[in-house]
Amino acid sequence: MDFLTNQNIVFYLLAYLIGSIPFGLILAKTFAGVDIKSQGSKSIGATNVLRVVKQTNPSLAKKLGIATVLLDALKGTLVLLVGIYYGVTNETLWAIAVLAVLGHCYSIYLGLEGGKGVATGLGVYIVLIPYSTLIGAVVWIVCAKVLKISSLSSLLGLIAAVISAIFIYNGLGINSNIPMYLIAFIILYKHIPNIVRLIKGQEGKVI
């Protein structure tokens, strides 16, 4: 099967192992001396980096938050771009994308714990469904400005990206939307605690 060639297996391993790198945790420990795994939401994502570091150094918190978003997004983007360079199939690219997000959310370096996948999902979506990702990003920015709730804004942006992709990229070039839905499901699943707090009106404003 072309899907399981030696070259593709290398890409799958790279996608998961690079996706597993907890950049938020590394940046917060290195530059702010804090362990975000034991504070705030205990997530390794940019929102928790911002939340925790902001308590002692607001200006540094913004810089580290931005750096975390960029690095987490690049975890997915770079492996996909290398895969495109080597001419792997669309099926393989989507498998790489799913594994990169899984790596971030269930990091092998953190005992299969991790972040919530938003930035890494953004990184893979922008390569594979760019127009829909831009639509989702616009929705996220508008909601963030109005609602000032990171989790809700991220989820609304994700939903907008997926719905628009159904019309713009239906089939994803592989006659199936399943990989896109799977990435969205992983991100939504990791946000269940946030969704529960939103329903109860207890979700804090971070943005």
From Swiss-Prot:
Localization per record: Cell inner membrane
Organism of origin: Aliarcobacter butzleri (strain RM4018)
Name this protein carries in UniProt: Glycerol-3-phosphate acyltransferase
EC number per UniProt: 2.3.1.275
Gene responsible for this protein: plsY
Annotated family: Belongs to the PlsY family.
Catalytic activity, as annotated: an acyl phosphate + sn-glycerol 3-phosphate = a 1-acyl-sn-glycero-3-phosphate + phosphate
Annotated function: Catalyzes the transfer of an acyl group from acyl-phosphate (acyl-PO(4)) to glycerol-3-phosphate (G3P) to form lysophosphatidic acid (LPA). This enzyme utilizes acyl-phosphate as fatty acyl donor, but not acyl-CoA or acyl-ACP.
HAMAP family noted in UniProt: PlsY
Keyword annotations from UniProtKB, A to Z: Cell inner membrane, Cell membrane, Lipid biosynthesis, Lipid metabolism, Membrane, Phospholipid biosynthesis, Phospholipid metabolism, Transferase, Transmembrane, Transmembrane helix
Pathway listed: Lipid metabolism; phospholipid metabolism
InterPro entries: G3P_acylTferase_PlsY
